[in-house]
Regions:
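Extended, intrinsically disordered, low-complexity segments
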Residues: 3-5, 12, 244-301
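Alpha/beta enzyme core
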Residues: 3-235, 239, 246-256, 293-296
Length: 301
């Protein structure tokens, strides 16, 4: 990307303030980020679930370290001019760890960073067996994250996973507490039905706090299109696993055919070709740079 981190943060804020609804797919590397950008999406989410799957080949159960996550975030941010939301998990420890995580993610180029109130080791928000920390402890983590910002335009988002454990009322209670602590966006994970998704929007209407929803195919929450979420009052939506599930099926189907046929003929029509990919990935620019910086090689060593 050519835009500075500061410019991307301002763009993210402008989207919030102007009611420009953000559709943020879960991105896990530089390539998926570039593809999202040329597809006309206006926001990206670094997905811990997808990064655990692609980097480790393991489930989203808290196996990745801050360093690995920061490295992935940096690769994503550098590849695109679109604002990126960083998945800060639990902050990888207490409020002091949250401070370090916030700073690392901000330096990596994140426009917004969210921190969740799960007990570590965390797990995907739609899996069974989650546990949450007391709201008071997470309030201090959110305060720490907000205070730690180097660029005050970085947006801190608070995520709560309490719905599955203590119900919707507790999710709303925690949402208000986290907003009071400085979180500008709330992300209430794994709501069960459309009514809960609507109720949440009503609860925070006129409070000045923005809301993000999360859509995971086959997860706990029903799939609701962006237009309807926007109408309810949401500021944006994560499609956390769509890219991962799509890539996994595409490759599995194609590799099965390759193993069977010994050739790519069966899936050739589903592929981008050599020249199209080289154009997309930016080879033309590098050809120009080669010309510009080519040395006259006639001189003797």
């Amino acid at each position: 990307g050519m835009k500075t981190s500061e410019a991307k943060r301002l763009e993210f804020r402008r989207n919030l303030e102007t009611g420009t609804f953000m559709i943020a797919p879960g991105i896990y590397d530089a390539l998926s980020a570039k593809i999202a950008e040329v597809s006309g999406l206006n926001c990206l989410a670094m997905g811990g679930y997808a990064i655990s799957a692609t980097r480790l080949g393991q489930p989203d159960v808290g196996l990745l370290s801050l360093t690995e996550m920061r490295e992935s975030l940096k690769q994503i941010c550098e590849a695109t001019d679109i604002p990126v939301i960083g998945d800060g998990d639990t902050g990888y420890g207490n409020a002091l760890n949250v401070i370090r995580t916030e700073n690392e993610y901000e330096r990596a180029g994140g426009s917004c960073i969210f921190f969740e109130d799960q007990k570590w080791p965390k797990r995907c928000g739609h899996m069974e067996g989650k546990q949450v920390i007391p709201a008071e402890i997470h309030v201090q983590k959110i305060r720490a994250a907000c205070d730690a910002r180097i660029d005050k335009n970085t947006v801190i988002m608070a995520r709560t996973d309490t719905r599955a454990i203590n119900g919707v009322d507790d999710a709303i209670r925690r949402g208000h507490l986290y907003a009071d602590a400085g979180a500008e966006i709330l992300f209430i994970e794994a709501l069960r039905d459309r009514e809960e998704v609507e109720r949440l929007a009503r609860e925070f209407e006129g409070t000045g706090t923005y809301l993000f929803a999360n859509m995971i195919e086959g997860g706990k929450t029903p799939i609701i299109p962006a237009s309807e979420l926007k109408e309810m009052g949401y500021a944006g939506v994560f499609w956390s696993c769509a890219s991962l599930y799509l890539v996994a099926k595409t490759l599995k189907d194609a590799f099965t055919e390759l193993a069977r046929d010994g050739t790519s003929d069966a899936f050739l029509s589903r592929m981008i070709d050599f020249s199209e990919f080289n154009h997309f990935i930016g080879l033309d620019r590098y050809r120009e740079l080669e010309k510009r910086y080519a040395a006259d090689d006639k001189s003797q060593p």
